[in-house]
Swiss-Prot record:
GO biological process: cysteinyl-tRNA aminoacylation
Disulfide bonds: none
Lineage summary: Bacteria, Pseudomonadati, Pseudomonadota, Alphaproteobacteria, Hyphomicrobiales
Keywords: Aminoacyl-tRNA synthetase, ATP-binding, Cytoplasm, Ligase, Metal-binding, Nucleotide-binding, Protein biosynthesis, Zinc
Motif ('KMSKS' region): 279-283
Enzyme class, broadest EC rank: ligase
Keyword Aminoacyl-tRNA synthetase: yes
Protein name (record): Cysteine--tRNA ligase
Molecular function as annotated in GO: ATP binding; cysteine-tRNA ligase activity; zinc ion binding
Binding-site residues for ATP, renumbered to this chain: 282
Organism whose genome encodes this protein: Rhizobium johnstonii (strain DSM 114642 / LMG 32736 / 3841) (Rhizobium leguminosarum bv. viciae)
């Protein structure tokens, strides 16, 4: 599309922002590391899902919906999964217990990301469906001298690769094993990492040339990206915490197995997330899952719509850290409440928003420009069509809510409850109900009954 500005992306590999030039404009390929399905995804996990969904949407707009391939994996073999299965399902055979954990967690992940307004990737491969592909890569690495067998394990020889460490820029003598599976003392070099590890009788395993075992963490993504995107592809994404060891080791495995100069041309990483100024952790008591945020009153004493969480994430540039807070969610909610409901539109997205997104996904500037469009869209059908197309590009299209009888009854009950709160001068709880309904696109209007003079509240769907 000639009118589309030049897309520039920051590349962690080069530490520079440069013009994006796909290997094949007819098939732009992107791989993003997905969840390990041992526990429900937390709000920090939501950030890469949202960031790379925006990039996916932008690439589809620039190159065409049928010319972009997006793969995001599911890691369903991991020691954390094994431990959770034994804890939650002690009465089941291990494989059945693992399946119960991974299926439940994966189902919840899909429900969560749908609530966040994310498009489905073209491919979402599971690690356990790609064991053969992993063993094939490992055999290649052994055959060309980049891996070795020690006490039944297969390890990658980091000193066999002259420029190992090119992504993280860390000297080899500072590198550590960096595997999720513990490595015993059979390594040639301190930084060597596990490709394949033997499994005991009470651990999941697959037959291989090196005995019954299971893969190391890093080899999974090398195998799945190769299968669905090829030896070399355009973009590899994930969180900043994955640069080392995970992405560094992916590069080493893939390049040495396939004899390529790169694995992916562009490496993109989103920044960290804190909660109310502190690192999110269970010990801090501020660990919040996406499900809890959207479906329970865990955070701020109320439920938050997925669109509010999405906008709250996009109000910070993806490479910057986010301090996640109730205040941030409230700010995003107030902004959304000012936007008109709109149907999907064939209009071209606004140029200022395209310019912002084309500058290394500058969603901060894009959201500011979108808000200006929203103000112009009230009462102007042409402006509203442009607003709708632009909001859709960000996954933020405000849709008019469909109200059925059951939902209407629930709203009526909340409105009645709020009136009782107001009569009791419990304004804090009354405001909570109003804010919750506003976030769902329902606007309240307070007034007085013309006959009795009593306070009454009416409501209508605004989006």
């Amino acid at each position: 599309m000639d009118a589309t500005p030049e897309l520039k992306l920051y590349n962690t590999l080069t530490r520079e922002k440069s013009v994006f030039s796909p290997i094949d404009p007819n098939n732009v390929r992107m791989y993003v590391c997905g969840p390990t399905v041992y526990d429900f995804a937390h709000i920090g996990n939501a950030r890469p899902v949202i960031v790379f969904d925006v990039l996916f949407r932008l690439l589809r707009y620039v190159y065409g919906e049928d010319h972009v391939t997006y793969a995001r994996n599911i890691t369903d073999v991991d020691d954390k999964i094994n431990a959770r299965a034994l804890r939650d399902h002690p009465g089941l055979p291990l494989n059945d217990a693992i399946r119960a954990v991974t299926e439940k967690t994966e189902t919840q992940f899909h429900a969560d990301v749908a609530e966040l307004g994310c498009l489905e990737p073209n491919f979402e491969p599971r690690a356990t469906d790609n064991i053969v592909e992993m063993t094939e890569i490992i055999e290649k690495l052994i055959g060309n001298g980049h891996a070795y067998v020690a006490s039944g394990e297969v390890l990658f020889d980091t000193k066999s690769m002259a420029d190992y460490g090119q992504l993280s820029k860390r000297p080899l003598d500072e590198q550590q094993a960096g595997a999720r599976i513990a490595v015993d003392a059979h390594k040639k070099n301190p930084g060597d990492f596990v490709l394949w590890k033997l499994s005991s009788h009470n651990e999941p395993g697959w037959e291989s040339p090196w005995g019954r075992g299971r893969p190391g963490w890093h080899i999974e993504c090398s195998a799945m990206s190769k299968r669905y995107l090829g030896d070399v592809f355009d973009i590899h994404g994930g969180g900043l915490d994955l640069i080392f060891p995970h992405h560094e080791n992916e590069i080493a495995q893939s390049r040495c197995a396939h004899g390529t100069e790169v694995m992916a041309n562009v490496w993109m990483h989103n920044g960290f997330l804190q909660v109310e100024g502190r690192k999110m952790s269970k010990s801090e008591g501020n660990f919040v899952t996406i499900h809890e945020l959207l479906q329970t009153e865990t955070f701020g004493g109320r439920k938050w719509p997925g669109q509010v969480l999405r906008l709250a994430m996009l109000m910070t540039h993806y490479r910057e850290p986010i301090d996640f807070s109730i205040k941030r969610l409230e700010e995003a909610e107030r902004l959304l409440a000012k936007w008109p409901a709109a149907e999907a539109s064939d209009a071209a997205p606004d140029e200022s928003v395209l310019n912002a997104l084309s500058d290394d996904l500058n969603t901060v500037a894009a959201v500011q420009a979108l808000h200006a469009l929203a103000q112009a869209a009230h009462g102007d059908p042409t402006a509203r069509a442009v607003f709708a197309a632009t909001a859709d590009l960000l996954g933020l299209l405000p849709k008019k809510m469909e109200i059925d009888e059951a939902v209407a009854s629930a709203v009526d009950a909340l409105v009645a409850m709020r009136l009782e709160m107001l009569k009791a001068k419990n304004f804090t709880e009354a405001d909570k109900i109003r804010d919750e309904l506003t976030a769902k696109g329902i606007q309240l209007k307070d007034g007085k009954d013309a006959v009795t003079g009593e306070r009454v509240t009416t409501w209508e769907v605004k989006r």
